Each structure stands twice: as C-alpha cells, then as structure tokens.
C-alpha cells in the first residue's frame, strides 16, 4: 500500500496557518477548508484519508474532524479506522469506532478487519459477537475475516459456531464464506470438515482448492495435497502461484515422481509470476536438487524476471552446493547494486555461499563488513573455517562470538565441535563440549554426541569413542555409529568396526555405504572370506554402492560427471587427456591405490576403475575447457563431490595440481581439499 506524506498546511485551518508557507505537495490538491460547505469539507478530508497518510498528518485530520463536529459521519469514521489500522494503531481505530453512534455492517467489518489484520484475533471475534445486539446482519465479507481469526488462533470451537451462524443466514456455501471455512477447518487440522465444505459449495474457484491444499500440506498429508492438485486438473481449474506456494510443505524430501509433478505443473502455467518461480526453486532445494535450482534461476532471469530477496536466499545455497561461484558473484553484485543490504538473511546466505565455494576470504569480507551480526552469522563463518580445515581459526572465532555478547546456541556448538574434529583439535573439542554442558547448560543432542565420537575416532581413540557411546544417556542413532565405523576403517579396528556395523545394519538396513565400509575394513585386514560374505549379502538385498558424482562449473554452466561416465559430448577427449595425465603422474611416482578400488573387482581391472572416478573426469574436463590466465582467482578449478574423496583421487589431485600448476579445490562430504603445487590443505588428515 502506497503511503503519502501530506503537508499539514494542506488542511488550512487557523490552528495550522503557520504551515501555509511550506511548499504544497503536488500529489494532492490544496485543501482550503475555511470557506467550504460541510459536504465539501467531508469530501476533501476523505480525499486525504484515502491516501493513507503518515501518523502526524492522520492525527491532524482527526483533530479537524473533531473541530468540525464530524465524528458521527460514518464515511469519515470508516476511513479514519482504516488509516489507523494500516499504521497498526488499533487502539485509535477502536476509539473512532466507539464514537460512531449508528453502526452498520460496513463499519463493524472494518473494525473486525482492523483487529484481525493486526493479530488481535480474540478482539475481532468479540466485535463479531456484538453484531446480534446491534441488530446488524453479517454479510459475505464479515465471515471470511472472523474465520481467519479462528484459523490463526486455532479456536475451532468458535469457528464451528461461526459456521453455524453463516448457515443460518444462508451464506455458508457461497464463494467467499466457503473459502474461509475450508481454510479455517484445514488450518485447524479438521480436514474431513474442510473437504465437506468444499464439496457443498455452490461455486468454487482456485482459492477454494488452494485452501484445501494448504490444509493437507500443513498437516503432513502430502499425498492428499498432491491428489487435490490432480483433482483440480480434472475439473478444469488451472493451478496458479498460490497452488504452488500451498504445495511447498508437501514436497520437502519427497519422491522424484512428486517433484516431477510439481515441475510439470509449473511449466504448464500460462502466466508465471515471481512467486511461482521462487516456489519451484524452493522445491528443488528442499529435495537436494541444487543443479536444477541454479538452472531454473538462470532461466528465470533470461525470461525477464528480476529476483527478490526470496529468490536470492533460495538460490545462493544452491550456488554453494554446486560451487557455482560465477553465478554467486553475479548475485552478490546485484545485491549491492540494488542496495539490498544490510539484510541479515542475505548476508548470512552470502557467507555460506562463498564458504561452500572455497572462497574463505570473500566469506570473511562479507562477515567483517556486516553492520550487525546474529548467531547465524558467526556460526556460518565458524563453519567456513572448519570446513576448510582451519580449526584454530574456527575456535578463535567462537571465542569472539562469546565476547560479542551473543550467546552461542546449539548449532554454534555443533559447528565448532565439527571444526575441531576435522582439524584434529582433540583437547579444544573436549573443552568446547564441557563449556556447552557445564557453562551454557545446553543438553547435548545426538548431533553433538556424533561430533564427539568423530573427534575421538579421528584422533585414533577408537576404544574411548566406543566407551563414550556406551555412556550416552540417549540411544545412539545412525550418525553416531557411522562416525565410529568410519574411525574403525581409518584405524583398522575390526572388532569394534563389526559392532558398529551390526548396529548400523539394524538402523539403516538399506544403506549400502555401511556394508562397503565394513567390507573395506575386512579387506584391509586381509579377511577376504568376510569381504565375499558382505558382497553376497549386498547382492541378495539388491544393494549397490552409491555412485560417485562430481559437479564442476565451466563458463557458468554446471557439468555433472558420474564414475565411468561416457555421456558427456567431450567424453572421448576427456579420456584421452586423462590417459596423458596418468602417464605424467606415473613419471612422478604415482602408483594407483588399489585399497580405494572396489574389492570385488579383479586386480587387473582395479587401476582402470580408479582412473574413471568422477572427480578425475571433472578435473580433466575443467583443465581442457579453461585457461590459466582467465579470470576468477587464477581460474581455480572448483569441484563438489557427493561422497568422501578416496585416497587414490586425493593423491591424483595433488599430482595434477603439481603437473598443471593449477589450484584445484574439491569439496567432499567432509571438508574442503585445496590442492596447490602437489600439496593438500588437509595435510593428508581427513
């Protein structure tokens, strides 16, 4: 709503003549009221109120109404109430309401709406209750507003009574009132009643159906929400941006089929709005599809839509997840040009994006330039240090967070503990955990406990990590046992590894990765019979190792490679160049690490299998399609991988960085690996 600041002298009455010398606003006619008739005065004052003026002007107009003895004028009263309510001054709106002697349905509706739109739901319902005493019959505008009060406050008992009142006056099946009833019952969790109202409505529009979709989605009835969308199609009701927004809670971590249905719905929409684009990007992000989110955002811009804060906060995490740094930088430039900061949400998203792209200094620049920071800002920067293996910097920043006057929350401690774990800071991690429990009195959650197990396990204290699990006050989850099993693989503890694996097979019987880990532990110990048994179990269960996948951005396009991928148009060139690189690596002493190959592969095939891991293909493709002198920090190659980098690829990346004199950054599920001149930033500790 556009609000106009009206010069006070426009009202031109004696008390305010000193304002007449000011420049008159060109947006409104000059109001000369001294010689006007009462009808003209009412008209001119009403014109000012229609502009929704600022509070100073509004009070001046109100004073003039009192001086002119126009308090009983219902037209001016209604406009005064609306203007006060728009400024969230509901008390003043109520005073105006109380001074109107004869109230009709319009006046009462405005008062109800003033309360409800400002969150005073109970007061709105009370005003509705006075209508019978005033002998005023509610209309089809009254009921939707008071039903909204019931929806927002969850007062289903009152909502049912209002439904009864609407039925008595014959309005319950009309469009506006019916929509309000569907929304009220749906949001209060009474979905069968919501459906019944919809079915009994004499006329239904897209809002009617969207209201039912919202009800199902908000009550975790995801399949029903999608079924209603399909039903809309069958009755020839077109989906709109509201339908998509209503569906968003229903398509979080859902099936690929459901995501494809929403995608199909989106592309079938005749006229797309920015809201619909934002929702579709959100659907992709809520279902771990960042590549698709980035591609859709680029398409949105190409179609002429200008992103808003919602678009940006949705797509920046996708840029981070895919290392789409060039797009992330472009969005940062847009934010600065449009002067969208200071804005904590955007600035925190920028820190996270730069951190995930391996641009630690850029993330730090955003952090340092923030006018104000919240705990999320500090946590994002601590995470940036931790993921880059700079545990000491993460711990130091955590100390500064405490000095800033903010209180670290549960997530800040998880992030700091993870940073200690990745950097091997055992004592610092122990101190952090003690600080959390003893000083801040934060009860450890499973995330904190998993970090402690990981911290102890990485430090080689596998037995202590196992005792820590045994002493836990809550039942360990998959993440806790997974951290222990990973430590057993690194430190060759077969006995405890078997115990951890047994627990994991009970908690996550369909997760192939844990079978592979146990198989690798047995293989490292030379227990080949057990390796065969594990592989046979996997085959009998139909389990396969999750395929490795790596993303790399080249010329602002994200390219995805799978292990052994031959689908890329440049595949033949990639494999030829890879063969050349492997020969050069062998000249420097490279020997393929057969421990990193699948143990059910024949020995002579292991080297071939290792050579086609996804990150190797992505590196070669980037080397072929970029030049060292191009922009972007000497054209660093940035790769994201869906699995932990294997030992062989780690060695290969070091050698390739040495051979090509190129910086290569690989972000796997654990941390960043920055390869420069044959050395990795992790110090071979990951």
From Swiss-Prot:
Residue ranges, annotated region (Type DYW motif):
587-686
Stretches for region Type E motif: 480-555
Could you list this entry's UniProt keywords, alphabetically sorted: Repeat
Q: Name one GO molecular function term.
A: RNA binding
Region entry Type E(+) motif, spans: 556-586
Which parts are the PPR repeats? 73-103, 104-138, 139-173, 174-204, 205-239, 240-272, 273-307, 308-342, 343-373, 374-408, 409-439, 445-475
Q: Does the keyword Repeat apply?
A: yes
Q: What are its GO biological-process terms?
A: RNA modification
The record's Pfam families line, in alphabetical order, gives:
DYW_deaminase, E_motif, Eplus_motif, PPR, PPR_2
* Family membership: Belongs to the PPR family. PCMP-H subfamily.
Record-linked NCBIfam families? PPR (TIGR00756)
Q: What is this protein called?
A: Putative pentatricopeptide repeat-containing protein At3g49142
Q: Which organism is it from?
A: Arabidopsis thaliana (Mouse-ear cress)
Gene coding for it: PCMP-H77
């Amino acid at each position: 709503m556009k609000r106009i600041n009206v010069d006070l002298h426009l009202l031109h009455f004696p008390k305010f003549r000193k304002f007449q010398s000011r420049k008159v606003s060109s947006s409104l006619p000059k109001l000369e009221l001294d010689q006007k008739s009462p009808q003209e005065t009412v008209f001119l004052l009403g014109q000012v109120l229609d502009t929704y003026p600022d509070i100073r002007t509004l009070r001046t107009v109100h004073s003039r109404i009192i001086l002119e003895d126009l308090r009983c004028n219902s037209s001016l009263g209604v406009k005064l109430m609306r203007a006060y309510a728009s400024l969230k001054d509901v008390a003043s709106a109520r005073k105006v309401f109380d001074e109107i002697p004869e109230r009709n349905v319009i006046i009462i509706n405005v008062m109800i709406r003033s309360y409800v739109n400002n969150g005073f739901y109970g007061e709105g319902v009370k005003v509705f209750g006075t209508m019978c005493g005033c002998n005023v019959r509610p209309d089809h505008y009254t009921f939707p507003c008071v039903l909204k009060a019931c929806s927002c406050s969850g007062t289903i008992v009152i909502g049912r009574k209002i439904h009864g009142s609407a039925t008595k006056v014959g309005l319950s099946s009309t469009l506006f009132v019916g929509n309000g009833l569907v929304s009220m019952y749906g949001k209060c969790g009474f979905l069968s009643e919501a459906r019944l109202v919809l079915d009994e409505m004499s006329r239904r529009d897209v809002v009617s159906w969207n209201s039912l979709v919202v009800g199902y989605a908000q009550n975790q009835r995801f399949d029903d929400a999608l079924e209603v969308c399909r039903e809309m199609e069958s009755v020839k009701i077109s989906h709109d941006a509201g339908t998509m927004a209503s569906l968003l809670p229903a398509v979080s971590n859902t099936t690929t089929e459901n995501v494809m249905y929403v995608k199909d719905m989106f592309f079938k929409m005749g006229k797309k709005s920015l809201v619909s684009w934002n929702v579709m990007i959100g659907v992709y992000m809520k279902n771990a599809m960042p590549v698709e989110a980035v591609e859709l955002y680029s398409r949105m811009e190409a179609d002429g839509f200008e992103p808003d804060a919602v678009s940006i906060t949705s797509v920046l995490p996708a840029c981070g997840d895919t290392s789409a740094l060039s797009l992330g930088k472009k969005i940062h430039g847009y934010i600065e040009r449009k002067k969208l900061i200071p804005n904590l949400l955007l600035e925190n998203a920028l820190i996270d994006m730069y951190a995930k792209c391996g641009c630690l200094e850029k993330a730090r620049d955003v952090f340092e330039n923030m006018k104000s920071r919240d705990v999320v800002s500090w946590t994002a920067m601590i995470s940036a240090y931790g993921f880059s293996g700079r545990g000491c910097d993460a711990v130091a920043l955590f100390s500064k967070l405490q000095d800033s006057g903010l209180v670290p929350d549960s997530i800040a401690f998880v992030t700091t503990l993870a940073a200690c774990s990745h950097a091997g800071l055992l004592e610092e991690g122990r101190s952090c955990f003690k600080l959390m429990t003893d000083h801040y009195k934060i009860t450890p959650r499973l995330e904190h406990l998993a970090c402690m197990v990981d911290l102890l396990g990485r430090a080689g204290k596998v037995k202590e990590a196992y005792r820590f699990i045994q002493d836990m006050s809550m039942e360990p989850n998959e993440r806790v046992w997974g951290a222990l099993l990973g430590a057993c693989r690194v430190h060759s503890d077969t006995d405890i590894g078997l115990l951890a694996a047994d627990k994991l097979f009970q908690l996550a019987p369909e997760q192939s990765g844990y079978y592979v880990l146990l198989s690798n532990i047995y293989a490292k110990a030379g227990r080949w019979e057990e390796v065969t048994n594990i592989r046979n179990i996997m085959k009998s269960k139909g389990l396969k190792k999750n395929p490795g996948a790596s993303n790399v951005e080249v010329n602002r396009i994200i390219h995805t490679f799978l292990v052994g991928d031959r689908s890329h148009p440049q595949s033949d060139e990639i494999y030829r160049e890879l063969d050349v690189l492997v020969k050069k690596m062998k000249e420097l002493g490279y020997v393929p690490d057969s421990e990193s190959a699948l143990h059910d592969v024949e020995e002579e095939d292991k080297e071939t299998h290792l050579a086609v891991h996804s990150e190797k293909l992505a590196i070669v493709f980037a080397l072929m399609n970029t030049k060292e002198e191009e922009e972007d920090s000497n054209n660093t190659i940035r790769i994201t991988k869906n699995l932990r980098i294997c030992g062989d690829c780690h060695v290969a990346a070091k050698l390739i960085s040495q051979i090509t004199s190129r910086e290569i950054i690989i972000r796997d599920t654990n941390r960043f690996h920055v390869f420069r001149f044959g050395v990795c930033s992790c110090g071979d500790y990951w």
